[in-house]
Amino acid sequence: ENTLDKGESDIELARKLKDNGYRISINIMATDLFESRLSCFEREAAMLLAGLTPRGCSKETQLRMYNGFMKEIEQLDTLGLCDDINVFVRGENINRPPVLKYSKGSSEYLNFKSAVVTERNRQREALLNEPDKYLLRIGKARDIISEYGVNETLTRNSLTGLKELQSDFIQELDKDEPEQ
């Protein structure tokens, strides 16, 4: 398991694995950035409810990672170092398995990148079509983190992050609104 964002060291590791007879399968979860950012806060809230110490993920880290892996996967594929590339989207809910949307060699998509971009765009459209649901989820995460936060600094950082996420989402909604 790897995040594929370390460049040459990832490529060298893949080369060593292939040289030793291993198959390399790359599985990508295509997730819209707004969904991904909120999911981190929802995971944090769930960990707090379970009495566990959460780990946060900053907006900066998310932005760096969001498309950072694509170039590396493309390079691994070009070098013949990956046997399978699969693109999934999340299941309908936490109890549903991820749904396969692309598999190298047999798919409606030209390549994994077009699958990732198209599926992310579909998710964005769905979020923008039902903004109240998304904003409600932000509110639920905020309430849980406010009530169960383990320390003042982490709680403040998370609440600031949620406020920024909500603001970013509202700006996106405003961009999407047709001018009158």
PLM region descriptions:
Residues 38-179:
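Conserved GTP-binding G-domain of TRAFAC-class P-loop NTPases and closely related GTPase folds
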